[in-house]
């Protein structure tokens, strides 16, 4: 991290503190560098700026929902779509939800696991590029077909 990004993350933390949304964490670490504690934030509605921004900090937001349809609607209304994670004891439910979630990378019962053999990237405003795997090469190349009779 760098100082401007640290201040951006601190700004989001200050907003969450002012709205009494911090469940755990929320403090800058007292050490050299630009670090903050992993932080759990409670969202009350989707108008919350923290709900709609990519912070790229150790901030995780949670919001209650009643139905699977409401969950999908909440998740997909974000203009971003880099990653998402589902935490559940019901694997069949997770498998039903996966195709409906607009995210380039989706984890079930884990988060931030990256495998170099699997493409990683986003959708929507999070970008369309991919890193890792053969998809990385294909994303940055253009195919050209050439046929020659000699």
Locate each region found by the language model.
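ALDH superfamily catalytic-core signature
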Residues: 1-45, 108
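Conserved C-terminal structural/oligomerization subdomain of aldehyde/semialdehyde dehydrogenase
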Residues: 28, 35-150
